[in-house]
A protein has these predicted regions:
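N-terminal non-globular leader segments, chiefly Sec-dependent signal peptides
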Residues: 1-89, 95, 103-106
Length: 106
């Protein structure tokens, strides 16, 4: 088994454990895959929630080639009362997938 080694100076960007647990429960109940491809972009504020026209569907948007299908639901996940961290994550449900994003994007 290969090990993943990170430089001690680099900061690991990953969803909160509570977010991963909630997403896993949703994925099992809804029979949808969990997608993390917007997490780092959302952490770096390189993606946003966009709308198709003034009354159209909302979706996650990185660029003209990378965007999700319309959003069916959005859920905020706080780190919990014992955490010193004020950051939070977001879970987005689309027709086919569950996307995790950092609250930094808002």
């Amino acid at each position: 088994m290969a090990a993943i080694t990170a430089a001690s100076n680099s900061k690991q960007i990953a969803p909160l454990p509570k977010t991963l647990l909630q997403a896993a429960v949703m994925a099992i109940e809804l029979d949808k895959p969990i997608c993390l491809d917007y997490y780092v972009a959302s952490y770096n504020k390189d993606c946003k929630i966009a709308r198709d026209g003034t009354e159209g569907d909302k979706f996650l948007y990185k660029n003209p080639e990378e965007y999700t299908s319309p959003l069916k639901g959005m859920f905020k996940v706080d780190p919990g009362p014992d955490s010193q961290d004020s950051s939070y994550d977001l879970i987005f449900e689309t027709q086919n997938s569950i996307y995790l994003a950092s609250g930094n994007m808002l």
